[in-house]
């Protein structure tokens, strides 16, 4: 039987979030709805989840000693990684000492870089993937591009939101792609993956929840990427029954291998009735923000329930829905959003502004959420609302 304490009391149930972005912010809110005490950690001050947590700390989460000291100080019941750039060897050590890492320290360690998860998926589990090769110097990189063939996709083994990712369409782009990958890695320059270009009809995220009662799947989410970063997502993505069954089988295999409880974002390419595994994140997924309006329980509420060992008897889709990322370009420490009365005049439409304190280049600062009788109409509505939004730097 699950017992939850009350926040800010001696018997509080405590969760430490490692990473405090917009996805973590929603998880914090859902945990607090259940009376949980939340500590938010990030590498910079006033990150979105820190703004709503009970307490916050600013450290380099790649510093294992600093991370260990903080965990020993707070002694949380659950450690919940929200980003890849964490000293995962320290998480393994903490788990061995009796701390609970969500979903597991192994899952966090394997998925923190693309090499660990790709080798697990393709070489151990035999899941269908694109052709690939890992390299750590420019000479081997050129050879890998020749072996894989053009076009091909280049990614740092450790990055998020499309940073460092590019597509090589001609041989004269090889140096540029290498340099961009070296600049975009979360932990600095280093190893990259060269992937064969996959011909596909569409991409999906199959959110998969491992919980006390078993494994459950959300309705598939379609999405559009730009430079490796999500721009729009919608739910449900129409797909054949055969393709959906195959996608669920792939998701079941990879999440079972990772273990633990919580939500996983399993990314796949779909071509006809065939599915190809791409990546998996052992945490809520950015494309899954659409569930804030499409479902009775969002991916964040489901994650909170799964973490705490609470049941998830069913997952209900309210209606077709879409999300449109608000990406701000420029340089500012005082971004303002205007004309919101017109944005929210669209029925069954909402907006989330993440509270990120600055932008330097381009950054996702919010999301428009819309519901309608079809995915197409929901997308149209989200775009209409977005077009009315005023952004002032």
From Swiss-Prot:
GO CC terms in record: cytosol
Residue numbers binding ATP: 114, 155, 160-165, 195-198, 203
InterPro entries to which the protein is assigned, alphabetical: ATP-grasp, ATP-grasp_carboxylate-amine, ATP_grasp_subdomain_1, PreATP-grasp_dom_sf, PurT, PurT/PurK_preATP-grasp, PurT_C
Keywords: ATP-binding, Ligase, Magnesium, Metal-binding, Nucleotide-binding, Purine biosynthesis
EC code(s) of this entry: 6.3.1.21
Biological process according to GO: 'de novo' IMP biosynthetic process
GO MF terms, alphabetically ordered: ATP binding; magnesium ion binding; phosphoribosylglycinamide formyltransferase 2 activity; phosphoribosylglycinamide formyltransferase activity
Protein name per the record: Formate-dependent phosphoribosylglycinamide formyltransferase
Keyword Chloroplast annotated: no
Native organism: Mannheimia succiniciproducens (strain KCTC 0769BP / MBEL55E)
PANTHER family to which the protein is assigned, alphabetical: FORMATE-DEPENDENT PHOSPHORIBOSYLGLYCINAMIDE FORMYLTRANSFERASE
Binding site for Mg(2+): 267, 279
Gene3D superfamilies in the record: 3.40.50.20, ATP-grasp fold, A domain, ATP-grasp fold, B domain
Sequence ranges assigned to domain ATP-grasp in this UniProt record: 119-308
Binding, N(1)-(5-phospho-beta-D-ribosyl)glycinamide: 22-23, 82, 286, 356, 363-364
Gene: purT
Domain of life of the source: Bacteria
Enzymatic reactions: N(1)-(5-phospho-beta-D-ribosyl)glycinamide + formate + ATP = N(2)-formyl-N(1)-(5-phospho-beta-D-ribosyl)glycinamide + ADP + phosphate + H(+)
């Amino acid at each position: 039987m699950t017992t939850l304490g009350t926040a800010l009391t001696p018997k509080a149930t405590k969760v430490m979030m490692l990473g405090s972005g917009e996805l973590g912010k929603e998880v914090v809110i859902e945990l607090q709805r259940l009376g949980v005490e939340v500590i938010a950690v990030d590498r910079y001050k006033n990150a979105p989840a820190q703004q709503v947590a009970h307490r916050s700390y600013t450290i380099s989460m790649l510093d294992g000693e600093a991370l260990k000291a903080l965990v020993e100080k707070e002694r949380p019941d659950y450690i919940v990684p929200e980003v890849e750039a964490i000293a995962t060897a320290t998480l393994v050590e903490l788990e061995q000492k009796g701390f609970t890492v969500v979903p597991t320290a192994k899952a966090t360690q394997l998925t923190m870089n693309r090499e660990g998860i790709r080798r697990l998926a393709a070489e151990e589990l035999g899941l269908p993937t694109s052709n690939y090769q890992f390299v750590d110097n420019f000479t081997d990189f050129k050879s890998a591009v020749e072996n894989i063939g053009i076009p091909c996709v280049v990614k740092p083994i450790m990055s998020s939101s499309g940073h460092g990712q590019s597509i090589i369409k001609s041989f004269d782009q090889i140096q540029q792609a290498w340099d961009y990958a070296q600049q975009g890695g979360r932990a600095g320059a280093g190893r990259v993956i060269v992937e064969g270009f996959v011909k596909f009809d569409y991409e999906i995220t199959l959110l998969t929840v491992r919980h006390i009662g078993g494994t459950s799947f959300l309705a598939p989410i379609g999405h559009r990427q730009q430079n490796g970063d999500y721009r729009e997502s919608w739910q449900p993505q129409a797909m054949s029954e055969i393709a959906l069954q195959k996608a669920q089988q792939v998701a079941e295999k990879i999440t079972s291998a990772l273990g633990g409880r919580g939500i996983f974002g399993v990314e796949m390419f779909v071509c006809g009735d065939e599915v190809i595994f791409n990546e998996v994140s052992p945490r809520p997924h950015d494309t899954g923000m659409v569930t804030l309006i499409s479902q009775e329980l969002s991916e964040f509420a489901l994650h909170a329930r799964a973490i705490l060992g609470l049941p998830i008897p069913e997952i209900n889709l309210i209606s077709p829905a879409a999300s449109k990322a608000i990406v701000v370009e420029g340089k500012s420490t005082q971004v303002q959003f205007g004309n919101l009365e017109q944005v929210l005049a669209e029925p069954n439409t909402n907006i989330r502004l993440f509270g990120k304190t600055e932008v330097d280049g381009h950054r996702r600062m919010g999301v428009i959420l819309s519901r309608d009788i079809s995915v197409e109409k929901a997308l149209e509505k989200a775009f209409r609302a977005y077009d009315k939004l005023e952004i002032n730097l």
